[in-house]
């Protein structure tokens, strides 16, 4: 895992087309902005896991299946 330190307003690049910018920090929360091509899916981890479990037919925690 690559660990980086960024300040508000600073950006990191993932490949040539994806940027992640730190928009703000408030307490233990960090607001980030992700700029990626339309064909690149960007999800929060818990949403991604739900999508994957729905694809495989495995109920997710708290799901109503």
Curated annotation (Swiss-Prot):
InterPro entries per the UniProt record, alphabetical: CsrA, CsrA_sf
GO molecular function, one term: mRNA 5'-UTR binding
Keyword RNA-binding attributed: yes
Biological process terms in GO annotation: mRNA catabolic process; negative regulation of translational initiation; positive regulation of translational initiation; regulation of carbohydrate metabolic process
Keyword entries, A-Z: Activator, Cytoplasm, Repressor, RNA-binding, Translation regulation
Subcellular localization(s) per the UniProt record: Cytoplasm
One Pfam family of this chain: CsrA
Main subcellular localisation: cytoplasm
GO CC term (a single one): cytosol
Quaternary structure and partners: Homodimer; the beta-strands of each monomer intercalate to form a hydrophobic core, while the alpha-helices form wings that extend away from the core.
Family: Belongs to the CsrA/RsmA family.
Purpose: A key translational regulator that binds mRNA to regulate translation initiation and/or mRNA stability. Mediates global changes in gene expression, shifting from rapid growth to stress survival by linking envelope stress, the stringent response and the catabolite repression systems. Usually binds in the 5'-UTR; binding at or near the Shine-Dalgarno sequence prevents ribosome-binding, repressing translation, binding elsewhere in the 5'-UTR can activate translation and/or stabilize the mRNA. Its function is antagonized by small RNA(s).
PANTHER family according to UniProt: CARBON STORAGE REGULATOR
Name this protein carries in UniProt: Translational regulator CsrA
């Amino acid at each position: 895992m690559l660990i980086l330190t960024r300040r508000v307003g600073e950006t990191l690049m993932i490949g040539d087309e994806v940027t992640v910018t730190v928009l703000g920090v408030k307490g233990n929360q960090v607001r980030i902005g992700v700029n990626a091509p339309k064909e690149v899916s960007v999800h929060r981890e818990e949403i991604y896991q739900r999508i994957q479990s729905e694809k495989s037919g495995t109920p997710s925690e708290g799901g109503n299946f």
